[in-house]
Amino acid sequence: MAVFPMFIELENEICLIIGGGKVALRKAEVLLDMGAEVHVISREFESELEQCQSPGRLECHAVDGGPLAAAVWLEQNARKEGIGNVAMLICATDDERINDQMVLWARKNRIPANSATNPADCDFYFPSVVRRGNLMVGVSTGGGTPALSR
């Protein structure tokens, strides 16, 4: 797969994260650092995610149910929760079935998706980032060996 390296403006953009564990926490921290509005949808949440909640910045939404629970919740509640015009979806669960279903949901809704369990399903990757003042460098292995890019 050929990927194009690019930087996008995320200030005040809505980003969804499915899953509330350590991977979700790391992704949320990166997105919040870029000024995004982050909504985390999960059955359970790392305590740090819940403690950092702030309306319009980081919001955690609890769901119950099987692999389609997050997609069903989004279909039923997105508008009333103020979640529209989603910039990206990050599937950060450790359940490949849930991540696969959410990638399908994202594609149906024309939302770029990233999957923690299947790099081949990713529309984009999170690079390792080095910042020095106004200089920002992103290094990626295209999801192949993320530890190598650190």
Mark where each language-model region is.
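Hydrophobic, well-ordered beta-alpha structural blocks that scaffold small-molecule cofactor pockets
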Residues: 1-44, 49-52
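Structural motif
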Residues: 14, 87-88
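ADP-ribose/adenylate-binding Rossmann-like module
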Residues: 88-94, 99-125
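Short glycine-/small-residue-rich Rossmann-like dinucleotide-binding loops
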Residues: 77, 93-94, 141
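An accessory alpha-helical subdomain
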Residues: 143-150
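Hydrophobic beta-strand scaffold residues
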Residues: 38, 73, 110-113
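Residue-level detector of alpha-helix initiation sites
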Residues: 22-23, 96-97, 143
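Glycine-rich, highly charged phosphate/nucleotide-binding loops
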Residues: 56-58, 62-83
